[in-house]
A protein has these predicted regions:
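Extended alpha-helical targeting/anchoring segments
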Residues: 7, 11-270
Length: 270
């Protein structure tokens, strides 16, 4: 069902989610292995990985699956989906984006018998760089979006697996709306010994949006800005493109090995 409107607060239905959880030992599990086991059975899953295993507060990784609601902003068009299969699609005032997101989050209530010091529910997703125009009074030159992704995209997930690397334990959560908990089925999947692996190979040649000479020229321009005191730091970027066949999660695995970061993420949006 599709509802088209321009009103901001036309619907405030509240969705009550019943929370179930199970704590398990995770000394033989890793975020990558868990993700590989669940991704074929639960499409549109996401991985948020921490490689900081030494700090208790920051040593959590998250795997989210089973999206039951979502919010997406593309241009000035807002799309929302809900657990009861309803859908809203309408134009928004760019100055009201924060209110729209806040309203969306308030439409969900969880019945948690226990509180946790780490994230176990809420919105998971991203806010792109160009979305700054919704939060700050700043003009951004409109450019073609070659990657064709929404400026803002978040989802509410039924299942969240939180891994505490510091204590070698994991929590499996199920936030259920009018359905039974699937924790035991999920536990069985992530403790299986096997998971599917797929090939990956590159095709064609590597291309870039800048030549070596153009990139070096930009560096010289940046040096002058720094010397004049216009800025104290600038980070230059250069985009490379490479065709491929197969499983792009292998790229994520390679990058986390070649150039590890304290925090990494892999989002599957289909």
């Amino acid at each position: 069902r599709l509802v088209i409107t321009t009103s901001l607060f036309f619907l405030m239905k509240t969705y009550k989610l019943k929370t179930h959880y199970k704590k398990i030992l995770a000394d033989t599990l890793s975020p990558v292995s868990i993700y590989l086991k669940i991704r074929d059975k639960f499409p549109n899953s996401m991985l948020l990985e921490s490689s900081d295993y030494h700090g208790n507060d920051n040593s959590f990784s998250y795997i989210c699956c089973n999206p039951i609601a979502s919010l997406k902003i593309e241009g000035n068009l807002l799309t929302k989906t809900f657990p009861d299969q309803t859908k809203q699609n309408y134009e928004i005032n760019p100055n009201k984006v924060t209110q729209e997101i806040d309203q969306f989050t308030k439409q969900f209530e969880t019945s948690e018998a226990e509180t946790f010091k780490f994230i176990n529910n809420g919105l998971f997703g991203y806010t792109s760089y160009d979305a700054v125009k919704y939060f700050e009074t700043i003009e951004i030159s409109e450019k073609e979006n070659p990657v064709k992704i929404p400026e803002i995209q978040y989802a509410v997930y039924q299942n969240i697996i939180a891994i505490n690397h510091f204590k070698n334990e994991a929590y499996i959560f199920a936030h259920c709306y009018k359905n039974e908990s699937n924790i035991e089925a999920l536990h069985h999947i992530i403790t299986m010994d096997r998971f599917a692996m797929y090939d990956f190979e590159t095709t064609g040649k590597i291309s870039s949006n800048l030549t070596d000479e153009e990139f070096k020229s930009n560096i010289e321009i940046v040096k002058k800005h720094c010397q004049r005191g216009d800025v104290f730091q600038l980070v230059l970027s250069r985009k490379f493109q490479q065709g491929f066949k197969g499983d792009d999660f292998n790229v994520y695995r390679a990058l986390r090995s070649i150039n590890p970061s304290p925090y990494l993420f892999y989002f599957d949006y289909g």
